[in-house]
Amino acid sequence: MKNFFLKLGVCALALTGAAEALAQEQVIQLFAHRGSRFEYDENTLPAFKASYDAGLRGFETDIRMTRDGELVISHDETLARLTPCKRVVETMTAYEIRKVKTNQGNDLIFLPELVDFFADKDNVYIEFEMKTKPVESYPEERLREYCEKVYNTVMAKKPANSLYLFPSSDKRALKMMRLLHPDVDLLLIISKPICEETILEAIDMGIKRLGCRIEG
């Protein structure tokens, strides 16, 4: 837990509806990072189903784009850690990725599938992290395409009283998303402790939420 991020507080302060009352009382809201990642393969549908069934209402996931422009749920640049496949996500087509199984035999999922799962679930907080590194995999036009597709896919089925955020450590992605959708909820991920510098950096980008280290 040494690299524990200040996202629990962000989650509590940002929730809407019934959870907003909890936030006003400064109650910390627990959430599932990549789903139930220790009990199930991370970022798979069983992982998210299990954590939701366990009563969690806050979640985080990661989005990358395949070579042919499909949005797949994957934290790592390659599939090597979770599957027998060693390839880079951005070099694969959606068809190729759909043929890959995790080491536990689960399917890799695409963003529309995850959005569909949460479409009928009220008062949920989700961080859809934009994974757009390495930078060379997402030049400006591809980055624009990515941001537009992510936003449209996620927001198309968002329940009215849920809160969906778009975090990233890539400032290019945050700026592009802000340019395309000025009212979007963003979160800046920084590997440094919270300090005046990080706060001012977020304010300068028009971002109200930080994901940063507590220690330091």
Model-predicted regions and their roles:
Residues 9-15:
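Hydrophobic helical h-region of N-terminal Sec-dependent signal peptides
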Residues 9, 22-216:
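Phosphate-group recognition and catalysis centered on beta-loop-alpha active-site segments
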Residues 1-8:
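Bacterial N-terminal signal peptides that target proteins for export
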